From Swiss-Prot:
It catalyses: L-glutamyl-tRNA(Gln) + L-glutamine + ATP + H2O = L-glutaminyl-tRNA(Gln) + L-glutamate + ADP + phosphate + H(+). Residues 51-70 are annotated as: Disordered. Belongs to the GatC family. Its EC number is 6.3.5.-. This is Glutamyl-tRNA(Gln) amidotransferase subunit C-1, mitochondrial. It is an enzyme of class 6 (ligase). It comes from Culex quinquefasciatus (Southern house mosquito). GO terms for molecular function: ATP binding; glutaminyl-tRNA synthase (glutamine-hydrolyzing) activity. One of its GO terms (cellular component) is mitochondrion. It is found in: Mitochondrion. Residues 1-23 form a transit peptide. Keywords: ATP-binding, Ligase, Mitochondrion, Nucleotide-binding, Protein biosynthesis, Transit peptide. Allows the formation of correctly charged Gln-tRNA(Gln) through the transamidation of misacylated Glu-tRNA(Gln) in the mitochondria. The reaction takes place in the presence of glutamine and ATP through an activated gamma-phospho-Glu-tRNA(Gln).
Length: 173
């Protein structure tokens, strides 16, 4: 877990959020001064085909309905690195690659479903009338009560461990 000293303030032009992101993306070896050489090729996210995570238009599949998908869909190293960055999950092992490819193969089975003539839904409860209530604050100014639920806080923020590292780690045997 990375803790920021209480008196530390972000430099002008930087927010606390950007500092936390910088620290969270730094390996512990980088913080101690002993840097290990990273052999992975870095992705230039400005040159991505889709810089936004939300597609701007529907994706047209090259697979036709009813066509069987290949048994294994290979995933290149650059895609794995992007997935690791977005999901904060380490996929370095061969077992993780197999699990990822199995998940892609399972999800690609939906391409064989014939949806011709079926209108898209906005919600699964489209036939039910959903009533909305007025947006009124009923119990405001409870920030301190909410922050008491956190194990670690820093300047009115929850402190979370970077990535998928739990706050309390079990001792290794």
């Amino acid at each position: 877990m990375i803790r920021i000293p209480f008196r530390l303030r972000p430099p002008p032009g930087r927010t606390l959020h950007s500092l936390v992101r910088t620290f969270a993306s730094t390996k512990p070896a980088d913080l101690t001064g002993t840097q290990e050489k990273n052999t992975r090729q870095k992705i230039n996210f400005h040159e991505l085909k889709h810089p936004s995570k939300v597609p701007q238009r529907p994706h047209k599949s090259t697979t036709t309905v009813g066509q069987s998908t290949p048994t294994r869909i290979p995933v290149d190293a650059q895609t794995v690195q992007l997935l690791e960055r977005l999901s904060l999950v380490d996929l370095d092992s061969a077992e993780a690659h197999r699990t990822l490819e199995d998940a892609i193969e399972f999800a690609s089975q939906i391409l064989s479903v014939d949806t011709e003539g079926v209108e898209p839904l906005y919600t699964v409860l489209e036939r039910e009338r959903l009533t909305l209530r007025e947006d009124r604050v009923t119990d405001g100014n409870i920030q301190q009560d909410v922050l008491r639920n956190a194990r670690v806080t820093e300047e009115e923020y929850f402190v979370a461990p970077p990535g998928n590292i739990p706050l309390e780690q079990e001792p290794r045997k």
